[in-house]
Amino acid sequence: MSDKPDMAEIEKFDKAKLKKTETQEKNPLPSKETIEQEKQTSES
């Protein structure tokens, strides 16, 4: 196998065959409210 990709293979690749997937955030950041609540509970 060669290191370089086969350009003919790339050119004939059909993007329409790719399935559209919904990206799901695995680890969403907490909201500002959540952060404030956690700060208040850790301070007391």
UniProtKB/Swiss-Prot annotation:
Main location class: cytoplasm
Protein localization: Cytoplasm, Cytoskeleton
Keyword 4Fe-4S: no
Disordered: annotated span: 1-44
N-acetylserine PTM sites in chain numbering: 2
Example of a GO MF term: actin monomer binding
InterPro entries attached to this UniProt entry: Beta-thymosin, Beta-thymosin_sf
Residue ranges with Basic and acidic residues bias: 1-25, 33-44
One BP annotation, GO: regulation of cell migration
A family per Pfam: Thymosin
Disulfide bonds: none
GO CC aspect terms: cytoplasm; cytoskeleton
Tissue specificity as recorded in UniProt: Spleen, kidney, heart, and oocytes.
Keywords tagged on the record: Acetylation, Actin-binding, Cytoplasm, Cytoskeleton
Recorded family membership: Belongs to the thymosin beta family.
The protein's role, per its UniProt record: Plays an important role in the organization of the cytoskeleton. Binds to and sequesters actin monomers (G actin) and therefore inhibits actin polymerization.
Name of this protein: Thymosin beta-4
Species annotation: Xenopus laevis
Phylogenetic lineage: Eukaryota, Metazoa, Chordata, Craniata, Vertebrata
Encoding gene per record: tmsb4
